[in-house]
């Protein structure tokens, strides 16, 4: 049983991410937690009394949130009739990232799947501010970011971007390995270098351990020269090899951190055209995945906060 968190702002982009997640796990038993957060714009100091009008405003926004979630579940069930899937809706008066982190802990979430941009995000940015904050803040769960117009493709070609400067633990690689096994995928290990040169002893050791963890999974190593920026280089690589999903770890000085810090002019062309799986840094003893009890329950309810 997998627990998948689907944040939504009811935009087309978030709907596309939901469709991707449901298609990705159509053969697996899953509970999908669909989250909508709302924070009404109320201009008052935290020390001032809240007027009846402000309370009414919050009630209206909460009602709209709950109604939107109810309609969304109806839409999903009408389009995807899958007995393996159940849905729990969560309407919360909270900041999105704070609520996502809370739900990951309390619901033992395996994966967060979210759209790259919200309802008001412009197209020219690398990723929307919410998804970037989510990736930077979440320390114990992978995040799968889905582009606005990406149509689901079975991820049979997965790229894993790494510079081999860091030792990866088995727990950190587990989301990548499980994804590859589920879809009999080939893993393309891609190393972007500013100028091509031989690997250091440390890099060779880390590559050897990476290959050991991947075991019998088909995988290849590709070393490519940087083109203007890491993001542009990975985009070209993904297009040329018809990559269906790009995975990377997020830690200090990682490719993911470099991409979010690149000057905007270097990121204009990178529209996250394929799904991006971002795995958090866990260390030696941590794990994204908790042991869960199998249950025959079929939760379909709305949680209020």
Please describe what each predicted stretch is.
Residues 74-112, 215-266, 274, 283-293, ...:
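Structural beta-alpha unit
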Residues 1-55, 157-223, 243, 271, ...:
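Small/aliphatic-rich secondary-structure junction motif
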Residues 53-67:
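A short acidic, glycine-rich active-site loop
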Residues 127-131, 203-207, 260-265:
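Charged helix-capping and loop-helix junction motifs
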Residues 113-116, 142-148, 276-280:
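Short beta-strand elements of ligand-binding domains
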Residues 131-151:
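Short, structured interface segments
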Residues 116, 191, 249-251, 280-281:
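Short secondary-structure boundary segments
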């Amino acid at each position: 049983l997998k627990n998948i968190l689907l944040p939504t702002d009811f935009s087309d982009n978030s709907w596309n991410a939901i469709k991707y997640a449901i298609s990705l796990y159509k053969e697996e038993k899953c509970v999908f937690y669909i989250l909508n957060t709302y924070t009404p714009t109320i201009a008052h100091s935290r020390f001032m009394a809240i007027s009846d009008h402000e309370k009414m405003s919050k009630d209206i926004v909460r009602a709209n949130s709950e109604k939107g979630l109810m309609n969304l579940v109806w839409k999903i069930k009408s389009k995807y009739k899958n007995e393996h899937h159940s849905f729990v809706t969560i309407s919360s008066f909270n900041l999105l990232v704070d609520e996502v982190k809370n739900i990951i802990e309390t619901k033992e979430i395996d994966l967060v799947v979210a759209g790259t941009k919200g309802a008001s995000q412009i197209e020219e940015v690398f990723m929307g501010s919410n998804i970037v904050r989510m990736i930077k803040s979440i320390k114990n769960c992978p995040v799968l970011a889905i582009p606005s117009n990406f149509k689901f493709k079975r991820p049979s070609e997965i790229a894993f971007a790494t510079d081999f400067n860091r030792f990866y633990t088995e727990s950190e690689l587990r989301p990548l390995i499980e994804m590859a096994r589920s879809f009999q995928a080939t893993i393309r290990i891609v190393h972007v270098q500013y100028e091509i040169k031989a690997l250091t002893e440390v890099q060779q050791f880390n590559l050897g351990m990476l290959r050991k963890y991947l075991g019998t999974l088909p995988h290849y190593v590709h070393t490519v020269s940087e083109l203007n920026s890491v993001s542009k280089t990975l985009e070209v690589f993904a297009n040329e090899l018809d990559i269906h999903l790009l995975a990377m770890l997020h830690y200090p000085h990682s490719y993911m951190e470099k991409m979010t810090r690149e000057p905007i002019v270097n990121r204009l062309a990178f529209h996250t055209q394929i799904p991006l799986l971002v795995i958090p840094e866990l260390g030696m003893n941590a794990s994204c995945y908790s042991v869960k009890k199998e249950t025959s329950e079929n939760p379909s309810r709305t949680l209020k906060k």
